[in-house]
């Protein structure tokens, strides 16, 4: 794959900056070292909070959460990190910006991580928080990477809930076939490789993943009805890219409303580049516009229906 052509100069600068903080071989280190290095990288890319935005920490359904005050419906944001790394500090500037730009309350859940807590611990935590929030009013779901997986699984767990206004999945891993499509075409993509995906999948389950568990791999479900309006975003240069389109297509085929967008030339983890890479900034604008529309019960204008 000719990434020199597909990926533009600002994105390459982001890739190099990421590699300086989180080298490609980090996945081969101990989990403790992976977390230490990841936390350092997150601090390096942290953009702070927009003016007037504050957050408070507490527990929801027994799960530690960070809450950014705002209007309802609230957004439950589930962070990425391969189910291994990340937490309340890793994505809170992203959550702060979402809150500032949409005016909505945003809640980030500090779900349990592997390998200490294999699947379904993270799913159980995310579903418990979502149910508690939904009991208080309408809700939106959003998440990137592993968090996109959790958001889709939680949507299934809440299937048909009238207060679930929509979900936005950002470069999610949804259990698509790693031996076909983007899994092969972008097996050696910058930022995330096919081997990385397989490593994190096995670690999540303390061994090979189950063959038919939609709480772990939402694309393994046999029923895609009753799911909320959905935006699923794939990064073109990412082995997970095809999962977004496959998921949106199945919702649409089941009579739901969903759209998939492939962001050209972007790589896994590009949300951290939203201030430095124009393509990433445009994608973040799309995310904000979609959350705003879903919150109002609308479909995003200018997007395919």
Model-derived features: where do they sit?
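Alpha/beta-hydrolase superfamily serine-hydrolase fold, recognizing
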Residues: 7, 56-57, 61-66, 70-305
């Amino acid at each position: 794959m000719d990434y020199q052509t597909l990926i533009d100069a600002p994105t390459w600068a982001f890739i190099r900056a990421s590699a300086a903080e989180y080298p490609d071989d980090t996945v081969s280190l101990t989990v403790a070292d992976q977390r230490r290095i990841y936390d350092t990288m997150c601090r390096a890319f942290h953009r702070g909070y927009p003016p007037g935005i504050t957050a408070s920490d507490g527990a929801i359904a027994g799960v530690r959460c960070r809450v950014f005050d705002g209007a309802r419906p609230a957004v439950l944001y589930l962070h990425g990190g391969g189910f291994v790394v990340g937490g309340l500090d890793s994505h809170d500037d992203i959550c702060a910006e979402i809150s500032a730009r949409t005016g909505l309350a945003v809640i980030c859940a500090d779900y349990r991580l592997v390998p200490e807590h294999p699947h379904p611990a993270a799913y159980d935590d995310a579903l418990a928080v979502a149910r508690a929030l939904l009991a208080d009013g309408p809700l939106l779901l959003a998440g990137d990477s592993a968090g996109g997986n959790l958001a889709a699984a939680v949507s299934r767990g809440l299937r048909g809930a009238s207060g679930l206004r929509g979900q936005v999945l950002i470069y999610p891993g949804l259990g698509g076939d790693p031996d076909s499509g983007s899994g092969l075409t972008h097996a050696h993509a910058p930022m995330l490789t096919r081997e990385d995906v397989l490593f994190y999948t096995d670690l999540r389950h303390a061994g090979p993943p189950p063959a038919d568990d939609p709480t772990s791999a939402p694309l393994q479900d046999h029923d895609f009805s009753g799911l909320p309006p959905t935006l699923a975003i794939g990064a073109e240069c990412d082995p997970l890219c095809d999962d977004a389109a496959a998921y949106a297509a199945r919702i649409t085929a089941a009579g739901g409303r969903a759209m998939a967008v492939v962001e050209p030339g972007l790589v896994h983890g590009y949300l951290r580049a939203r201030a430095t890479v124009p393509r990433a900034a445009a994608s973040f604008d799309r995310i904000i516009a979609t959350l705003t529309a879903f919150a109002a019960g609308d479909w995003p204008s200018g997007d395919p229906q």
